[in-house]
């Protein structure tokens, strides 16, 4: 995770993003190109996660959200899913102390109730250990889907209406937003997708309404500081209008 010999330089490009989300794609193809099983690529992908978290800490990002396991990933072969779950457990066990040491707050977003009790306990333990940290907020999206996120928020609003707490005609974007994952963080400014595909794959559908999108052919295990830096530099060149006609300085909003 973050290196002890690197300082938090806060050297983001001018008007750099505060919250970056990454769709980590390409582990399987990376492994296949080397004649290995897909899990070999997922294991290599953990190293890319370490590099990315370290980069985010040392460059002063407020939040980094990583798409680790989508709700659709259960359709993969059972052996691969099982291996991914075990890898998740091992990664939590091996990395959470380092995250805590570097003032990183870890949160897992998604429907974690489908995970094994063992994995759910690791998640809870890791979140509790780091919950008071004030540095980077690292969000791991696991068994997460953007549609699920919106639906679970709507259900909570519906319960309030049913109980007479909320009037249907008073519901607005702000009402729903407070029940959507990541509502307490800065909006997602930049979405990076590795692996060459140009799609969102049901990731943070509500939260990325005005995010800039950056696609790279680099497979996730090869994603490093240089590629991350390139994405931030590309972001700095964008003119963000948020639906208007005049570019807006996100730092001033």
From Swiss-Prot:
This is Ditrans,polycis-undecaprenyl-diphosphate synthase ((2E,6E)-farnesyl-diphosphate specific). It is an enzyme of class 2 (transferase). GO terms for molecular function: ditrans,polycis-undecaprenyl-diphosphate synthase [(2E,6E)-farnesyl-diphosphate specific] activity; magnesium ion binding. SUPFAM superfamilies: Undecaprenyl diphosphate synthase. Pfam families: Prenyltransf. Belongs to the UPP synthase family. GO terms for cellular component: cytosol. It catalyses: 8 isopentenyl diphosphate + (2E,6E)-farnesyl diphosphate = di-trans,octa-cis-undecaprenyl diphosphate + 8 diphosphate. The active site is at residues 25, 73. One of its GO terms (biological process) is cell wall organization. The keyword DNA-binding does not apply. Homodimer. Mg(2+) binds at residues 25, 198, 212. Catalyzes the sequential condensation of isopentenyl diphosphate (IPP) with (2E,6E)-farnesyl diphosphate (E,E-FPP) to yield (2Z,6Z,10Z,14Z,18Z,22Z,26Z,30Z,34E,38E)-undecaprenyl diphosphate (di-trans,octa-cis-UPP). UPP is the precursor of glycosyl carrier lipid in the biosynthesis of bacterial cell wall polysaccharide components such as peptidoglycan and lipopolysaccharide. CDD domains: Cis_IPPS. Gene3D superfamilies: Decaprenyl diphosphate synthase-like (3.40.1180.10). Its cofactor is Mg(2+). InterPro entries: UPP_synth-like, UPP_synth-like_CS, UPP_synth-like_sf. Binds 2 magnesium ions per subunit. Keywords: Cell shape, Cell wall biogenesis/degradation, Magnesium, Metal-binding, Peptidoglycan synthesis, Transferase.
